[in-house]
A protein has these predicted regions:
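Gly/Pro-rich turn-and-neighbor structural signature
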Residues: 1-4
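Extended, Lys/Arg-enriched charged tracts that mediate electrostatic binding to polyanionic substrates
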Residues: 13-16
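Ser/Thr- and Asn-enriched, surface-exposed coil loops between beta-strands
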Residues: 37-41
């Protein structure tokens, strides 16, 4: 498609893959390369053809395109994306699903369910980190207010399971721990607070200074730590980085006084360093702080 303002349609070479669930694997059974010229391009070779369980447009990633998954294909992925062994095909499905979620064409809870199904079988750290980040954004920012707590609880359960199953001391373990801290609600606050004092820390997980600030900020966001605890952490990490993180933790607190102080500092104090300003802005708005 093209906008009315810029109606130019360019030719694309597009792969159309047909995948069928066989012996617990989503296997590609057909691949057609199609040249797209117009707004609609009939594909005669597929007329009367079995649609399979998944139809993947732009299979093999031949062109730069924003594609959509049909309802049947999406239902297949939500149920069995872990059966799609081809990493490129799986990456294309992840990309399409995230585009649909961001464009309000896929419910946030369905995206979180999809991530929960496929995340355990992903081994690439970049993919794991991106999926955790995107699922967290979907749960916190894109879900309906009335469903948000349920969606976040589901995500927290997914991340807790991933953390439990991750290899001790691995980067994947850190990715799950970071995600859990970011997505955590008040129900997980006791666990996170325990990590700060060395209690029930998963085997191999290093609670270094970076992780400590992530935990402090998460706890500040849900009102489980306040100014005294943030000041104590800053005394422990009396560095420029510590000062920046403390500013963010204070801005995350769910009180009118904390928000007013952060707002004033961000909008009226020209001496605020760039990274401190970034922390203030990043932590100021929290979707779960609606009052």
């Amino acid at each position: 498609t093209a906008t009315e303002k810029y109606p130019t349609l360019r030719t694309h070479r597009l792969g159309v893959g047909i995948y069928t669930l066989t012996d617990d694997h989503l296997t590609r059974t057909e691949l057609l390369d199609v040249d797209i010229h117009d707004e609609r391009t009939p594909i005669a070779a597929l007329v009367g053809h079995s649609r399979g369980d998944l139809v993947l447009l732009n299979d093999s990633d031949l062109t730069y395109a924003k594609v959509r998954l049909d309802d049947h294909s999406m239902a297949t992925l939500i149920d069995r994306i872990d059966a799609l062994s081809d990493p490129l095909a799986r990456a294309l499905c992840w990309s399409s699903a995230w585009d649909m979620c961001r464009d309000a064409e896929m419910r946030a809870q369905d995206y979180v369910t999809l991530v929960g199904k496929g995340l355990p079988s992903e081994t690439d750290l970049t993919a794991v980190t991106a999926l955790i980040r995107q699922a967290t954004t979907a749960a916190i920012s894109y879900s309906n207010a009335e469903d948000r707590q349920e969606v976040r609880d589901r995500l927290v359960a997914i991340l807790a399971t991933g953390l439990r199953d991750a290899m001790p001391g691995s980067d994947h373990q850190v990715a799950y721990a970071n995600g859990l801290a970011t997505a955590a609600t008040t129900d997980a606050a006791d666990l996170l607070k325990g990590w700060l004092s060395g209690e029930e820390v998963p085997e191999g997980l290093s609670i270094d200074q970076g992780m400590r600030w992530r935990l402090v900020t998460a706890l500040a966001r849900v009102g489980r730590v306040g100014e005294d605890e943030i000041a104590a952490e800053l005394q422990r990490d009396n560095t420029i980085s510590g000062s920046e993180q403390a500013a963010g933790a204070r801005a995350a607190m769910p009180t009118a006084q904390a928000k007013q102080a952060a707002w004033q500092r961000a909008t009226t104090d020209d001496s605020v360093p760039n990274e401190t300003y970034r922390q203030l802005v990043m932590q100021f708005i929290q979707p779960d702080q609606t009052e």
